[in-house]
Design a protein with these regions (language model features):
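Structural motif of enzymes handling amino- and sulfur-group chemistry
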Residues: 285-393, 425-426
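Conserved N-terminal alpha-helix of the aminotransferase class I/II PLP-enzyme fold
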Residues: 53-102
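Short amphipathic alpha-helix segments
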Residues: 402-412
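N-terminal glycine-rich, Lys/His-bearing helix-loop that initiates the first secondary-structure elements
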Residues: 1-54
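Conserved PLP-enzyme active-site core in the AAT-like
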Residues: 12, 72, 100-113, 117-336
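Single conserved hydrophobic/aromatic residue that forms the stacking wall/gate
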Residues: 440-449
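Conserved PLP cofactor-binding pocket of PLP-dependent enzymes
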Residues: 413-428
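Short, surface-exposed ligand-recognition loops at beta-strand->loop->(often short) alpha-helix junctions
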Residues: 395-402
């Protein structure tokens, strides 16, 4: 390891790097043995040259003592997960190497049994439906989605969060639940939608606190909210909880907008306020569900990437995400002032002035710049959800002249600019630290739109 970085990396990553620097004589898995199998042939050598020796050297069995078993929660692996829990404000963290689909199923399996009532955000990911309904045979009550006229999903419709109605639905489906203080074992809420809206976790907690034992916030499309002053208050992990509140589980797709390899995910558990109560989910129960769903042959670099994500966010998170949000605002302004046919989804007029005429710092300091709706009744309808500053949803029907978003998507991709997704008249761009250099490359193509 380079002298200037030695001792500055988190424990699991440093141990892994040190291990790969030593000559190994493995008689265990994986069979490529640090790439040696591939290097027996010219074609294999081309393969290892492309990826680099470190990728193969770091792919090792968990049979050895160093750097330890990533699934054990002990030693350097345990220290890595503790770092993530501390960084994100949780009591415990589990690193999951097979995506948030698996993380969601783990949480459902840990909490739900046959005929338990589960309150489901209708916009839940399929993994939630699989875990809660197919695997656990729980009974669902769905919360309707709030949709814009062009089909964009903006979160849960607050009218479906009526406690009296939800208790009535629970009693209709499971009559004996009428006598329970909290009829629902679990509620599942999408913290951030794929269309670029973020829920106010404090509002959700206030509406559901008397109804359920636990809330699972599926934050697959979030995770950075607590590192931005604008969105910090929206995070479930910044909430101060009492024994009157549900326990919280948060799943995050670290690979989506955070710093992780594809498939890396984490489960964050915040429920120490329930310890000793009957509704408390013991760590070992969640761990058993975790062990049921993971591979016994983990890819160590994936685990290391999750540790590095926590390490970087703990040390630099606020600065990096503030810079990313600043870039996202500047890009929105550039599109609004340069483009004729496309526009980012935003409240266009704020206190009588166009959105883009305000300073970037002011836009990033006040929620009103991110509250969807122009009229008072419209704003009230969306008051519990906010436009995500780090997701730019472009609409291709500016000034009432719609054209297929796919045309713009293909045009941009020909110029090596790749949107996250494309709808009929919308394009989604994800913004994260490191994107600032893209501004100069995207300016000219978008100017023509």
């Amino acid at each position: 390891m380079d002298k200037e970085i030695k001792g500055r990396l988190p424990p699991f990553t440093e141990a892994l790097i040190n291990h790969t620097k030593e000559k190994q004589f493995p008689f265990d898995t994986p069979g490529h043995h640090g790439g040696d199998f591939y290097n027996l042939t010219e074609e294999g050598k081309a393969f290892t040259r492309f990826y680099g020796n470190a990728m193969f050297a770091a792919d090792m069995s968990d049979s050895g003592n160093d750097p330890g078993n990533p699934s054990s929660h002990e030693g350097a692996a345990g220290a890595a997960e503790k770092l993530a829990a501390d960084t994100f404000g949780a009591d415990r963290a589990w690193f999951v190497l097979h995506g948030t689909s698996v993380s969601n199923r783990i949480c459902c399996q840990a909490l739900l049994s046959e005929n338990d009532l589960v309150l489901l955000d209708r916009n839940s990911h399929k993994s939630v439906y699989q875990g809660a309904l197919l695997q656990c045979s729980a009974i669902p009550v769905c919360l309707d989605s709030l949709r814009l006229k062009n089909g964009i999903i903006a979160g849960i419709d607050k009218r479906s969060l009526n406690e009296k109605h939800l208790r009535k639905e629970a009693a209709r489906l499971v009559p004996e639940s009428k006598n329970r203080k909290r009829p629902y074992r679990l509620a599942v809420v999408q913290l951030a939608t794929y269309d670029g809206f973020m829920a106010d976790a404090k509002y959700i907690l206030m509406k559901l606190r008397n109804l359920c034992d636990y809330i699972l916030f599926d934050a697959a499309w979030a995770g950075y909210e607590q590192f931005l002053s604008l969105t910090e208050s929206l995070s479930p992990l910044t909430l101060v909880l009492t024994d009157k509140d549900p326990g919280l589980l948060v799943t995050q797709s670290v690979h989506k907008q955070l710093a992780g390899f594809s498939q890396t995910s984490q489960i964050l558990k915040k429920d120490s306020h329930l310890r000793g109560k009957k509704r408390y989910l013991p760590d070992d129960v969640l761990d058993n569900a975790f062990l049921m769903n993971i591979s016994t042959s983990p890819y160590f670099p994936f685990f290391s990437a999750l540790e590095m994500n926590a390490f970087l966010h703990r040390k630099y998170g606020h600065t990096l995400w503030q810079d990313a949000a600043r870039f996202a605002v500047e890009l929105r302004k550039k599109i609004l002032t340069s483009c004729r046919s496309i526009a980012p989804l935003l409240p266009r007029i704020i206190d009588g002035r166009p959105w883009e005429t305000y300073s970037t710092e002011e836009i990033l300091s006040a929620p009103r710049f991110w509250q969807y709706g122009e009229k008072r009744n419209e704003k009230e309808h969306f008051s519990h959800t906010r436009i995500d500053p780090c997701k730019i949803l472009l609409t291709t029907n500016r000034k009432g002249r719609p054209y297929p978003a796919m045309l713009l998507s293909l045009y941009l991709q020909e110029r090596n600019i790749t949107p996250e997704k494309c709808g009929l008249h919308t394009l989604l761009f994800l913004i994260q630290p490191g994107d600032q250099l893209s501004l100069i490359h995207i300016s000219e193509p978008t100017r023509l739109a």
